[in-house]
Design a protein with these regions (language model features):
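Bacterial N-terminal signal peptides that target proteins for export
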Residues: 1-8
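Cleavable N-terminal signal peptides
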Residues: 10-11, 16, 21-22
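Cleaved targeting-peptide boundary
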Residues: 21-32
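Non-globular targeting/processing and membrane-anchoring segments
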Residues: 22-24, 76, 92, 96-128
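Thiol-based oxidoreductase modules, predominantly thioredoxin-like and allied folds used
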Residues: 29, 52-69
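Short pre-active-site segment immediately N-terminal to redox-active cysteine/selenocysteine motifs
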Residues: 30-36, 79
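Typically the conserved alpha-helix immediately C-terminal to a functionally engaged Cys/Sec
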Residues: 37-53
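A short, hydrophobic beta-strand/beta-hairpin element that forms part of a small beta-sheet core
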Residues: 79-94
Length: 128
């Protein structure tokens, strides 16, 4: 009986672990003294992990001097900040620079929906 329980547990655990291992992540490449990197961190850094996008693609930061540690980049990182959507060591898309909160969210959502199974939550606007 114990063997059956272990097999059932294994059957249900492996897909969950596999899904987590294949999760997307958003890599932010920054550098010391980067004004727009600081702007992003001040405006969005504290809320990003709480958003649907942040839960789907958790943020991992690298200094531009550490960019060689990132496996699977399609091209060099020239600008900071650069946000790179990665999955299984493969670059899916990138955003170079940061100009505003609205612009960032809109572009990130487009990349996530196009390149992954992410579906953005629908916002219902009401008129008062």
């Amino acid at each position: 009986m114990h063997l059956i329980k272990k097999i059932v547990l294994l059957i249900f655990t492996v897909p969950i672990l596999s899904k987590n291992l294949m999760a997307a992540e958003l890599i932010m490449v920054e550098q010391q003294g980067c004004y727009y990197c600081e702007e992003w961190k001040d405006q969005l850094g504290h809320i990003y992990p709480k958003t649907p996008e942040g839960k789907y693609a958790p943020l991992k930061t690298f200094d531009i001097t550490e960019v060689d540690e990132i496996k699977g980049l399609e091209r060099d990182v020239i600008f900071t900040p650069t946000f790179i959507l990665m999955e299984k060591n493969k670059e899916l898309g990138r955003l170079e620079g940061y100009s505003s909160e609205d612009f960032f969210w809109e572009l990130l959502e487009v990349i996530l929906e196009k390149e992954t199974e992410y579906t953005a939550p629908k916002v219902i606007k009401t008129i008062n």
